[in-house]
Amino acid sequence: GWLKSGGYQAPDQSVLDEFLRQLRASTGDARPQLNSGSYRLQRYKEAIYLLPEDPGPVDQELAIAPGGVIEIPGVGRISLRRTESEGIWLAADESLSLQWRDGGERCRLAGHKRSKSLKKVLQEAGIPPWWRQRVPLLYLEEELLSLGSVGPCQSSRWGVSGQDAEAPWELVWEPTIASGYD
């Protein structure tokens, strides 16, 4: 039922039985998976994820402006929208860029005392390994402002009202993922 509700064809019973056997037999960090060609079932921590076919790497830098929405195959829907709570102060005409992990980036999440590597921040946020290269990073020139929907980084724009800024903004990432099942 779970696969069909997502519009996917169930695998042969023998393939599904083998996947279930691997799930029961695996321990710790093992991540059994079932590849069907059009989707993949994979365990991460205590959940089974139904993932669309891997669309390949994401590496192009994209421009986004406050109020903008971008749909990226294999990544999802990314928007920069106003928030009523604390956020990133931007002028409506500022041009920002969405980039992807390259390695070595650091962020001090807003409200935290220390900066950490993005790898560590994403692990602590529970982002599955296969999604970590797809988390959109919001930059203003060379300054990292936010990590997908993980949260904003402490920056020159966090919580500081600029004279051209009308309201705070937040980066919202809705990943392309069929679902996770506990």
Predicted regions and their residues:
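AMP-forming adenylation/ATP pyrophosphatase catalytic core
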Residues: 1-182
